[in-house]
A protein has these predicted regions:
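Signature of the N-terminal lobe/flap region of pepsin-like aspartyl proteases
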Residues: 1-75, 194, 217-221
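Active-site beta-strand/loop microenvironment that shapes enzyme catalytic pockets
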Residues: 14-15, 166-194
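Short hydrophobic beta-strand that contains or immediately precedes a catalytic carboxylate
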Residues: 2-3, 8-13, 19-21, 172-176, ...
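Short strand-coil-strand connectors
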Residues: 1-6, 60-67, 116, 163-168, ...
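Pepsin-like aspartyl protease folds
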Residues: 1-7, 38-53, 79-80, 136-168, ...
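Aspartyl protease catalytic domain
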Residues: 67-167, 244-251
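Aspartic protease catalytic domain
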Residues: 76, 219-285
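A residue-level signal for conserved active-site and pocket-lining positions in enzyme catalytic cores
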Residues: 13, 59, 87, 134, ...
């Protein structure tokens, strides 16, 4: 970020649309290319909250450097373990905390002719190398054909319908910024009840969770756009409860729709094409 560049670690988040950096992760005063927009922002991310000032600056990821990208510079540090959040959902008045005219990185890079296609390829292997390709699809990451969705009609989030062991999860938000798979309590319970090798428990807050034997994990797979992708055990494992493992699928209080978080992204190479608003899925090597 900036010039000279300030290197920082961000969470690439398909569930939000803004680039928000912690106070310690970026100092606009050290950048010759920063511009103070003299506007403020107020940003909520999960249970975290940050406010601060809006700037524009140079931003580079994956070898692609765009100029005049809006950045929220927090007045504190809100993102534990990361320097900030790099939003990759669709930017609009409903989804953005920024009241600015400047384009977010996804569109700025395309308009400035830095990439031919506004395409982002996530290949998140649960045990091994994870990559994000910007502006292109790396076919060497793939072990099979790409299946493409129809045009995404939601102007805020990426959405997809999938099946887990034959149980349909419909029109779910695909969100790399959430570290579990969740949905409405009654629907989560119904799905977990249908999974062999998974026991269902009700928590005091009314949420449902699934548990399985760590020595004998269930065989789970997602069916997406006609292709089947195994749910690897390291991706489905959300932690331990005694001698049992907690499944990374559970409900949380007040959850009204399904969210396919990062464990879902660890099952396939997932491609987001902003130009035609489609998602692609393929097996990874």
């Amino acid at each position: 970020v900036g010039f000279p560049p300030q290197k920082t670690l961000t969470l690439f988040d398909t569930g939000s649309s803004d680039l928000v950096l912690d106070k310690a992760a970026y100092n606009p005063k050290w950048s010759l290319s920063s511009k103070n927009l003299h506007k403020q922002f107020d940003f909520s991310y999960g249970s975290q909250h940050v406010a601060g000032d809006l700037y524009t600056d140079k931003v580079a990821i994956g070898g692609v450097k765009a100029s005049n990208v809006p950045i929220g510079h927090g007045n504190g540090d809100f993102n534990s373990g990361n320097g900030g959040t790099f939003g990759l959902s669709f930017s609009n008045s409903e989804n953005s905390a920024f009241d600015v005219q400047q384009l977010p990185f996804t569109w700025a890079a395309k308009k400035q002719h830095l990439i031919q296609s506004s395409t982002y390829q996530f290949t998140l292997r649960p045990t091994g190398k994870a990559t994000l390709n910007v502006g292109r699809v790396d076919l060497f990451e793939l072990a099979g054909p790409i299946t493409w969705s129809d045009k995404n009609t939601d102007h805020t989030f990426w959405r997809i319908t999938t099946e887990l062991n034959g149980n349909k999860i419909e029109n779910a938000i695909a969100d790399t910024g959430t570290n579990f798979i969740g949905g409405p309590p009654d629907q989560v319970k119904a799905l977990l009840d249908n999974l062999d090798g998974v026991s269902v428990e009700l928590a005091e807050d009314g949420s449902y969770g699934g548990f399985y034997s760590c020595q004998n994990p269930p065989h789970l797979s997602f069916k997406v756009l006609g292709q089947t992708f195994d749910f690897p055990e390291p991706a489905m494992n959300f932690g331990f409860n005694g001698d049992k493992c907690r499944l990374a699928i559970f409900s949380t209080p007040g959850m009204q729709e399904w969210i396919l978080g990062s464990p879902f992204f660890e099952t396939a190479s997932v491609i987001l094409n902003y130009d035609v608003r489609r998602m692609g899925f393929a097996k990874y090597r």
